Amino acid sequence: MRVGDRSRYGVSFFVMCVLVAAWQCFVMALDTQLGGIGNLLHEWHVVAISLANALLLLSPYWLIPRRWRWLVWIPMALLTLWCLMHMCYCRAYDDLMPWRSLSLTDNVNSTLAASTLSLLRWQDLLVALPLVALIVARLLMRGHSEQLSAPAVKPFLLSLAASLLFGAVGYLDGDTNYARRFLHNYGNRSYYARNGLLPYAAFTLHEEFRSQSLTDDQRADLNRFLLEDCPHYTDNVYCKVSHRNLVLLIVESLHTWPIGMTIDGREVTPVLNALVDADHQGVIYAPHVLFQTSHGHSSDAHFIYNTGLLPLRDGVVAVNHGDGPYPTLAGALEGYDCREVICTPGMNWNQTVTARTYGMDTLYTREDLMAAGDFDRHQGFDDAAMTAFASRLLPQLREPFFLEMVTMTMHTPYTPGRVPPSWILKSDTLNAEARGYLSCVHLTDSCIGALLDDLQHLGLAQRTVVAIVSDHTQVYLNRVKGLTDYQATPDDWGIPLIVAGCDTTLRYPSVIGQVDVFPTLLDVMGVNHYGWKGLGYSILRYPVAGAIQPRNMSVIGDSTALTPHQRQAWDYSRLFILDRHNRSY
């Protein structure tokens, strides 16, 4: 190799690599946790932490023989992709991606690709362009000469020393409890911003692969909690007619704020509006449900609604622990014909397995809808195809039945070709994202109306409870209005619970959690003989006024009304999931 070739991987190039890596780590911390690029000049301790981590990450560069130093491009490229991936993920799910999510290859499809591309922003060039500039600089260094003897131990030691120096500037803080700082994780993005890339990687990898079995003390503590702190009532005072059918609609990304909204004088959700009308009897309506999904996203919501448990804060329960057994809504509805219809392939989020775990007798997937020709007849719009499929399925069900349906049309991105045509797209009163989202909401609302019409036409409406819930948030109203997340209220982020066809009429304005839906449905269906009531509270029995979200375990709603049970439920749910094979229901 020529001297000119060797010199291109000398001190100057190493320094440039360190600066690029540190800048990328810093930008990612700004974008995901520290309020964005506007706070660039206020976070010098994070700059020091980023430099310390970049130096430590790249210091092995000096221990590699010169002819192999081109390998430095591998960590540089991977770091660039890693930062971009987490920035996009955080925009969708408000946290960094857990390592196990990288193994969810069954979820990779055109919808995921389109969703990811829609999350890219112009500021992401601040991560990508430095790598491009480094490539250009490397090409321009052909004639530059630096003579270093091998092995380059001295530069390696200097790199470590510089890393320690910058680490001292960034990490040393007289008021910091270092054990708590480095050994406790109250949110991935917060941990990363406070501690940097390498501590974050080490801590989260350790958490991902630590022992998944309970100690005897943990099992005894869990049993005490389940026996003493969980409800055990058996009465059915809120249900006058037993053995009704149940249709559970889990609607993708449905917020409460579009309900009742008009655009250019027309209702966005006429069907849902009619259901929640104040004069409509036999309807429970809770507009301020707090989403409690974690890294499993939609699958976490399915898990909560079907089991009454809370998901893992540090993994994807449907994939890593989807085999059960768990107590389930279908288990409480003993003797029911239990079916599930989804718009996606069964492999997505491990739904082929979880459908059995949740007690479903039959799962119908995207393949079934396509084989029936419903996608072709409805221009590929998922919810319309699913409703058409359900219209033929309903007459075949044995009563009483439990039919769970999971919609998909309202999944991001809201781009041309994926958004159904409507007058909403022509309105100039909202931004493009809101117009696309509301067009999808309008289509799904009409599909719900078609399902209700089918129930009425088949003579099933009077014997059927229809529960409509949402999996998680997507388009906050405060963002549509141009306000910040710090100005968000329950009206901006709330997702709805609507239960129609029951014996109770209730409008519940307080904040509740998704985990409170399970026991509420047990009350509505009159199946409290089932021993498991979930980790939430039925809003027909208890004055729930707040809930805890998993990102940083913050209380949303009235913190003074929160019970010790609600505060402890996340930890005990994790123990329950890990100990599920030692339990029977």
Residue map of PLM features:
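Intrinsic-disorder-associated interaction segments
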Residues: 4, 19, 211, 215, ...
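Transmembrane and membrane-interface helices of multi-pass
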Residues: 2-202
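Membrane-interface segments at or immediately adjacent to transmembrane helices
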Residues: 167-249
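Generic structural signal of hydrophobic/aromatic residues within well-ordered alpha-helices
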Residues: 26, 60, 108, 218-222, ...
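Short, structured coil/loop segments at alpha-helix boundaries
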Residues: 61-71, 176-205, 212, 265-270, ...
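A diffuse structural propensity rather than consistent per-protein peaks
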Residues: 88-101, 118-121, 210, 215-218, ...
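Solvent-exposed soluble domains appended to multi-pass membrane proteins
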Residues: 223-585
